[in-house]
Swiss-Prot record:
The keyword RNA-binding does not apply. The gene is lmo3. GO terms for molecular function: DNA-binding transcription factor binding; metal ion binding; transcription coactivator activity. GO terms for biological process: positive regulation of transcription by RNA polymerase II. SMART domains: LIM (SM00132). The keyword Metal-binding applies. It comes from the Eukaryota. PROSITE patterns: LIM_DOMAIN_1, LIM_DOMAIN_2. This is LIM domain only protein 3.
């Protein structure tokens, strides 16, 4: 049977002094701290709710945890282990699922690879780029090619 991954919220709760201490799902000891975490319908010490891979404290990293294959994971490790990867359209190397990317039509690029494929000029926010035969071109190289060949591309 195929189990789907799930993400769950993490709540930080203040412990009221007059309430009976709750048991921690991580260490099975009573939680006597000022704050506790609630996740997966269980209560946790702040130090006990950790990513199974990197040991980061999930209450500090964000408000979401991920579970799959009986593991409790932070977002980065969840994506690293179970996320979909692809290849960069410029360098053909693998792009990890957790890495930031740039997209142009159906092409996906590493941030460092998102540059004119003729002159290697990196693009800044707001710069125009053109697609010609799945190549990214800066405006200068596109216009030079247009003058030489009379081709057209799609402006992005």
């Amino acid at each position: 049977m195929h189990r789907r991954e799930q993400s769950f919220g993490i709540q930080m709760l203040s412990v009221q002094p007059d309430t009976k201490p709750k048991g921690c799902a991580g260490c099975n000891r009573k939680i006597k701290d000022r704050y506790l975490l609630k996740a997966l319908d269980k209560y946790w010490h702040e130090d006990c709710l950790k990513c199974a891979c990197c040991d980061c404290r999930l209450g500090e990293v964000g408000s979401t945890l991920y579970t799959k294959a009986n593991l409790i994971l932070c977002r980065r490790d969840y994506l690293r282990l179970f996320g979909v990867t692809g290849n960069c359209a410029a360098c053909s190397k693998l792009i990890p699922a957790f890495e930031m990317v740039m997209r142009a039509k159906e092409n996906v690029y590493h941030l460092d690879c998102f540059a004119c494929q003729l002159c290697n000029q990196r693009f800044c926010v707001g710069d125009k780029f053109f697609l010609k035969n799945n190549m990214i071109l800066c405006q200068t190289d596109y216009e030079e090619g247009l003058m030489k060949e009379g081709y057209s591309a799609q402006v992005r």
